[in-house]
Amino acid sequence: MLTTGIFWMTVLISHIQERGIVGVEGQELVHPKKLPLLHKRDLERIHDSDIPEEYEEELLYEIKLGKKTLILHLLKAREFLSSNYSETYYNVKREVFTKHPQILDHCFYQGSIIHEFDSAASISTCNGLRGFFRVNDQRYLIEPVKYSDDGEHLVYKYNVKAPYATNHSCVGLNFTKKSALIDVENIEEHNAEDHHKEKFIELFVVADEYVYRRNNKPQNKLRKRIWGMVNFVNMIYKTLNIHVTLAGFEIWSAGDKIEIVSNLESTLLHFSTWQETVLKKRKDFDHVILLSGKWLYTSMQGIAYPGGICQILRSCSVVKDLLPDVNIIGNRMAHQLGHSLGMQHDGFPCTCPLGKCVMGDGSIPAIKFSKCSQTQYQQFLQDQKPACILNNPFPEEFNDYPFCGNKKVDEGEECDCGPVQECTNPCCDAHKCVLKPGFTCVEGECCESCQMKKEGAVCRLAKNECDISEVCTGYSPECPKDEFQANGFPCRNGEGYCFMGLCPTRNEQCSELFIGGAEESHSLCYRMNKKGNRFGYCKNKGNTFVPCEEKDLKCGKIYCSGGRPSSRLGEDKAYNLKNVKQNVTIKCRTMFLHHNSRDMGLVNSGTKCGDGMVCSNGECIEMEKAYNSTICSSPCDENDVDDNEPECQCEEGSIITEWGEALNLTSVSIMVIVLVMVIIGVGLVILLIRYQKCIKMKQVQSSPREIRGVENKGYFPEEHQTRSEPILTDIHPLHTTAESLERVPSSFSSPHYITLKSVSKDSRGIADPKQTDNVNLNLDTQSGCERLG
């Protein structure tokens, strides 16, 4: 007995030392017992393949912890991997290899504790139970005991008072003025306007060489470690109705691809450049996280660009991975992802005790998002409209075997709030996935207290003068699609024109580029755009900076005054223009952004540059050309603001990236259509005349008489029938069409008109009224009758 006790004590001590677990207090040896399921709830599904799954869809485990018995209820994490999931490695020659494994089964689960309302779990069952679970505010780590054949596990209790537990910090990059401090009094009001639709974030993970070296044995150890982190992140973000899925990972197994230094801002800048110029060209994702295992002399545990989600250069973050506890690293990933979604650190008055909140400064795994974080996230959605997280990465055919309880409204269901023990929605019957009697809706901006709001109730307020308020229809729980004023609608008392729901001005752009109250500089500063260098140009073609023409000066590099530059964004340049006679000095400041393929230092497209003129790709052009329509650029009628007619509203997402190219393409398309219609029209007229001629010639007549166009009211003898459609002879883009018009004299100019005229008894001619001689296209009417007859 004593020998056995000493053995287990040695095992426990060696296990703790090997794992190096921090932020925990004590441990308890447990023997999880697998329980039979009391019900299947439609879990026996038909799979597309005949390959049986090794891991069950639903599990129950009994864990006796202290004096309590916990029943752990687990459901396999669905849509855990994106449909385009990939894994990338490098060989010893530094050659890159990417594979797309078709993983049909996995051992990662999420769930809760039965009979505990406030509980959650993120567990893998690959080799025993490993992961995180909580009951109320108390959090636990469970792991199998190494070298044990009897199913022993260790359960650690996270200690919020442990010294290390308050040592978590990250680099706090400045938020723009749009991410202002939250007014706590309006928190509930903002939550009432919550966006209920599920969001999707395709997460990609990059592991540096140090992480690889520590986790390369056994071969799949690092894969399972990354999967465990993402499973934890997904569990946390489900509380915001965000589904985080793993798009793939890349392992720098043959050396780091960037320089990783103690200054995390510099490391983030290097990583953002690499992922934009290299990774994005071979992989699609919404956000990428670099896990760095390099020992850096800094207490900072991570860094991210504030509000950077869906932005090519800024949707990335760096997280230090020096601890063996997957849950703590997953918590850091969730924290940095929160910054990318517009969330700031929790502080007064939104303090979050006991390390419970994701955006707090605790190191142990968090439980939830604070009210401030939720409000900041909702405000970010309204202001920035990040489109990438609205895209469901799973096609319909990928979402197999529907069942009641999967939190998706499948065919035949009215609602689905998840498993019975997890459902908290008062409107939905979780057993049958139907609405409870007397209720008409479950959720949505136009659903209140399980009843649809009346027609005309405002469900989305206009955010600015270029936006339009949306109202409920009375028959749908969802708010209608977000629409806004037509592009070109005057805004800010004539200072600008609306563009895609915003009113872009140079003053606002300056305040975003520079910190501390910058505004547009004097108009004389824009003369510097004639220089044709990186601090003054209108177009960037390769490595050549094209100087601005006179008319385009205010659409080149933007010049500001006041504020201070942000070294994080790029390099600034200041000019001092001095007027000796008036003894006046004008300061002109501009910025050249680092590693940015689309230079945001140029004046934004849609910014006013004259009456009826806007900037477009470094040029000042008329609004009709910029927006490719005189209709959409004209203001809406007073009574038509709220309807869906295209002349008054422009849909989101219809922005033309290259206006010039789109305009040329549209012009060619219009010319092709006009040519085809003219050719068809001329052919039909000729065919009709020939047919009528045949009919008249077949009639037996006693004496020749004048044939009048009785049936064809458009034809009269000795009168000209004139077509009003212009013929476009400039048809060089369509050589095959031009060949069919070889008989048309080259002297014809466009536009001109075709005149049909009676030339003789047996022939008809097509004549140009400007020509002295008719061009006759003689037709053999007799042979034509035989062919038609």
UniProtKB/Swiss-Prot annotation:
UniProt xrefs under SUPFAM superfamilies: Blood coagulation inhibitor (disintegrin), Metalloproteases ('zincins'), catalytic domain
Residues in the Extracellular compartment per record: 24-667
Any one GO cellular component localisation term in the record: plasma membrane
Domain of life: Eukaryota
Polar residues composition bias: residue spans: 772-789
Alphabetic keyword roster: Disulfide bond, Glycoprotein, Membrane, Signal, Transmembrane, Transmembrane helix
Signal peptide: 1-23
S-S bonds: C310-C388, C350-C372, C352-C357, C459-C479
Phenotypic consequence of gene deletion: As a result of decreased egg fertilization male knockout mice produce a 15% reduced litter size whereas female knockout mice are unaffected. No difference in male gross organ morphology. Reduced epithelial cell heights in the caput regions of the epididymis, resulting in increased circumferences of the epididymal lumina. Infrequent histological abnormalities can be found in the caput epididymis, such as sperm granulomas and mineralization-like features. Increased frequency of intraepithelial vacuoles and hyperplasia found in the cauda epididymis.
Protein name: Disintegrin and metalloproteinase domain-containing protein 7
Designated gene of the protein: Adam7
